[in-house]
Amino acid sequence: MKKIISTGKGQISRVTGNRRLRSKLFLLLIVTCGSASFARAQGGNLIDISGQVVDQQNKQALAGVSVSIKGSIAGTVTDDAGNFKLRTKFKFPLTLVFTSIGFQPQEFEVKSIESKLYIALLTQTNLGKEVVVTASRVPESRLRSPVAIEKLDIRAIRESAAPSFYDALENVKGVQMTTSSLTFKVPNTRGFNIPNNFRFMQLVDGVDMQAATLGVPLGNAIGPTELDIASVEITPGAASALYGMNAINGMANLLTKSPFTYQGLSFYHKTGVNHVDGIDDAPSILTETAIRYAKAFNNRFAFKINIGYMQGTDWRSNTRLDQNTNNLKSANPGFPALNGANNVAFDGWNKYGDDALAGSNVVSLSGLTINGNPNQTLRVARTGYWETDLVSPRVSNLKFDAALHYRISEKAELSYSYRIGNMSGVFQRGNKVRLDNVVIQNHHIELKGNNFVISGYVSIENTGDSYNVKPLADNMDLYSGGATDTKKPDSWGTKYKNALLEYATKNGGGLTDANLAAATQYAREQADASRVKPGTPEFNQLKNTIIKINNWDIKSSSIPDAPETGGAALVQKSRLYHTEAQWDLSSKVKIFDLLIGGDARVYEIIPDGNNFVDFSRPIDDRNKPEADGSFGANIYYKKFGSFAQVTKTFFDEKLKLFGSLRWDYNPEFKPKYTPRLAAVYTFKENHNFRFTYQQGYRFPALFEALSYVNNGRVKRVGSLPYINEGLGYLENSYTQQSVINFNAAVSAQGNTDEAALANRNLLVVADLPDAGPEKIVSYEVGYKAVLLNNRLVIDIDAYSNQYNGFLGQVQVFVPKGVSVGTDAAVLAMLDRNRDATTATSTTAASQGQDRYRVFTNAKNTYHNFGSALAITYNLYKKFTVAGNINFNEMKANKTEDIFVTGFNTPRWSTNLSFGNREIVKNIGFNVTWRWQDSFLWESPLVTGGVAAYSTLDGQVTFHLPKLKSAVKLGASDIFNHRYIQYAGGPTIGGLYYVAVTVDGLLK
């Protein structure tokens, strides 16, 4: 039954159904006779509807209230006086929808013309009742979403104690943030965290923000500014069923402000200071500025422009721990005199060129007599350089975006948007990369109706002046200090060995435990004599030369065509073409809701001859330029997909069932089908129980699939099987760990050929499979409730994931010219046979070995599980306390795999916040305490423990309504408790800032 209120010549009614009760609780509609506002018929069947919206509590006009017509894209916003005017071709009855931050969204049915509307909205807390679109690709209540989903709206972003909306993601239930740089932060959910997170998708208004060859979004480098962000929706866990192959760990969708709804000129400026303790750098100023302007004309055409610039001094990665301690087989466990600070195989967390653990910068000094024992061998690492000497701490991000919107009709809107960002910072995958003048561009065109979306975009990537830190350190050492081996009289290894023997002769006549530490220290000093020293003009000149050369090899007898100094430049250029469409057929099917969609994506890589090559060219020519200067034909990597989702409610809408099926095809692999089944049951309106089953797949990212780069004489190769042709690393190689164990055993037995053949059983054949997509099977249960008269929200979920074919990297050793298992292959695995050797009186000749780091699938199945609980409670008036606690665990496997997967997630983490958006008139505050447990971080670059830490963030905001301004005074990590978020990552401390926002000028 509808409740009709007489309004003179017209009528207006409340929409019936379940909204009726909520209307009484959260919204008061007062319709009075007057002359200020009206609806009237126009020529050409146009209707003008106008009115005023005020706050019922204080009768003040409400500016910025969104007023739209249900079932269309037509809408407007109220002006500073709360007035609105809307022209439409719709016929009566029609439904108006009013939404505003802090007020319950509500629908009203206008039944006839000439109604005079005066609307007063009742301020109410809206805990837990947000509308989200990401979980099912259609608007729905967050309480009844089929999967876990979190949302930060404008109010939550403004009130957050974090210094930016992007930093605020770290306080969301289930989210773990990894900070590689001030300009580069990477969110993740539900385990297997890495700084280059291929498993977590980030969208801006539905557009994938990834830099294609790097494989991940560069933080918020081309994302929204603080002025243009409207909301953020985060889906922890698999979202592949509707969004495709990259979202098996989760996704974030950053939604920006419509120029129709949010008009005028806005300004934002933040000034902060970090490094206040002066440990890693002098106290440094950070600034961020943004400007936004948006304007709509006749509610038909609108545009917006955003520009933002941020600059500061980065957090420094300078942890001087050793990850290759002397008790490991990759060091010298037989010589305890070399323990601790005396470790000659030192491999520092943030040092490069000393990569003893990976075996790429190690010389094997054989034939030594130590403690009177002949034929002893020492493994000695090159000295290398610290990251702080190789990477500038200055970072910046300049970004611009603009959008044009045109409402073709009341049911269709066409828009074009352009984004560009230039950023510098630090990125980590297998090694650290200094990003410098990286430019990402995005062109997006979209046609959107009330039941369909057609979208297409192209993203353009150029890594600019970036460089890889490891080849920089390697080549600086090799060029100025000499080759690593001991085969040449002027090599670093020969100089080290000669100095070692010289010291022994002058100090007792031999090497013993008593003088071994001093002897190796002296030998390093002598071998390093010609090496360029940080801070000198020679160092800077050599560095500047190397980082501009896009060839990471260095000239040698085996690579005569390589540059004299070697190079380290990261030159990657690509384009990503994407188109997609979805159509809501619910109004046509009637018996259930049906959503269908499809997409196509093409990556285009311009080969640079170093990171990406044209595989149609002969192996020996792939790194050489052609006559026109190019490195061959462009490389294409494609994916196509489609999906269908059915939704049906039962039992008076208490039970809601979801079923979806997605099909994805990449020409390099077999097609994959991704199902999702979910059920949501609502009990007594406020209690919602959820169960979800889904599968997901992930095709290898571009670098995982197609890379072909020599880095420290270890070639990184993609997972596609045809790359193996002529190289043999899949079927003719030994695992790295088995080679380390083999060499340790042989060294302990005199480092002879006989000892090598006697220990051949220690070598393990890698036997790598043809790589395929990664698969996840996920189960999830959840409960959401709004209790105590809308003052308490409880949100709890639990999940269980099973990964098959987990993608990662394994390093393998290929014996040149011979087959694994033969005597020649065994001898080729000796450290002294890294390169081809000739026969001596005691050793056989060897063709040497090649080393590859291969992207491939794990052989084990991995099972991780966890749970998260979030509670929000409105204590008293506007005081709110909120918190979440998160548990994540991975089940241990009984057998070791060919590579370490790296769960890289704390078992326990928690956030607790307390605040009041208006403790006194126009002043609000919020404080957030965050803690996470210690955990083990494992990666190809650094493996080590990450200590537990806690931080306290806080902010006080002063609102100046007459000036349309707000001043936010805040700090993250108030007490400057220094911490790291991952092994090898930067040390983070306190950031103290003041931010000024001026909003809504020149409307």
What is each stretch, according to the model?
Residues 22, 294-300, 306-312, 395, ...:
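Conserved C-terminal beta-signal and adjacent last beta-strands/turns
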Residues 116-120, 165-168, 185-191, 200-203, ...:
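N-terminal periplasmic accessory domains that precede
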Residues 268-436:
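Periplasmic-side early beta-strands and strand-to-turn transitions of outer-membrane beta-barrels
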Residues 46, 50-58, 65-70, 95-103, ...:
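Short, acidic, small-residue-rich periplasmic hinge/interaction motif at the N-terminus
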Residues 649-651, 794-936, 997-1002:
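Gram-negative outer-membrane beta-barrel transporters
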Residues 722-851:
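Membrane-embedded beta-barrel scaffold of Gram-negative outer-membrane proteins
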Residues 87, 141, 149, 166-211, ...:
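Extracytoplasmic beta-strand/coil segments of soluble accessory domains associated
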Residues 85-87, 207-238, 291:
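Short acidic/polar hinge/loop motifs at secondary-structure boundaries
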